[in-house]
A protein has these predicted regions:
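Conserved N-terminal segment of class I S-adenosyl-L-methionine
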Residues: 1-104, 108, 131, 158-189, ...
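A conserved beta-strand element that flanks and buttresses the S-adenosyl-L-methionine
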Residues: 116
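Hydrophobic adenine-recognition pocket in adenosine-nucleotide-binding enzymes
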Residues: 120
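Histidine-centered divalent metal-coordination motifs
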Residues: 123
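Conserved catalytic-core motifs of eukaryotic protein kinase domains, centered on the activation segment
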Residues: 126-127, 155
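A short glycine-rich, Lys/Arg-flanked "PGG" loop and its adjoining helix->strand segment in the class I
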Residues: 128-142
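Conserved class I S-adenosyl-L-methionine
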Residues: 143-165
Length: 212
């Protein structure tokens, strides 16, 4: 049976970002994705070797999941039920896509070597629960990226976007500065690296017992 559509929830703004006509937005997005690629390349420098099983939570149309699959063997990617996303997923052969909620991940504890969430946590009604779930199903690494506030909203205002909402992108329920996001992630994992590909914050963290 097909999963029911998610009503009243903003799935995200991935498509607008990846297909933007504005050359500045395209450039910033390319740099952000390159930063994620660099973070992925650092994983596996310990005795465990490269990750073998990877999960992306909130995968959108699958761009990041596809890049993950180019590096790692098994990639599972999930997002909320949405007909548009299902159409996008058909373009990618490698990752295994499914519908699920970040608040209740349908996997056993310690299932994945690395869990990735890129522009997801800001959308969650309960980000603490989402973070705990990612830590539960992960066994080694977390790679997490969110808009860096208040910079992200300021950029929207400068571009004349979402002015009536003071620059807040639709669906962004949570807002972190670089420092507050590091503090947030540190609840469940040891933060090893923080980068700031403008206007985002990206964190690589190691889960308890994730390195020998």
């Amino acid at each position: 049976m097909a999963a029911p559509e998610t009503v009243g929830v903003v799935i995200g703004n991935h498509t607008q970002k990846y297909t933007a006509r504005n050359p500045a937005i395209r450039l910033l997005t390319e740099r952000w994705v390159a930063n994620l690629d660099r973070a992925f390349g650092q994983l596996g420098g310990d005795a465990h070797g490269p990750p073998e099983q990877a999960l992306e939570v909130g995968c959108g149309e699958g761009v990041v999941a596809d890049r993950m699959h180019r590096r790692w063997g098994e990639v599972v990617a999930l997002d909320l039920p949405d007909a548009g996303l299902r159409a996008d997923w058909r373009r990618y052969r490698g990752p295994r896509f499914l519908h699920a909620s970040a608040h209740e991940l349908p996997f056993a504890d310690n299932r994945f070597d690395v869990v990735v969430a890129a522009e997801v946590l800001e959308h969650l009604p309960d980000p603490d629960r989402g973070l705990r779930e990612m830590a539960r199903v992960g066994r080694r690494h977390l790679v997490l990226s969110v808009p860096r506030e208040p910079v992200f909203r300021s950029c929207n205002l400068v571009a004349g976007r979402y002015v009536r909402d003071l620059g807040n992108t639709p669906g962004h329920l949570n807002h972190w500065s670089r420092r507050s996001f590091v503090r947030f992630v540190s609840q469940v994992a040891e933060v090893r690296e923080v980068t700031s590909p403008f206007p985002w914050t990206t964190v690589w963290a190691v889960l308890p017992g994730g390195e020998p």
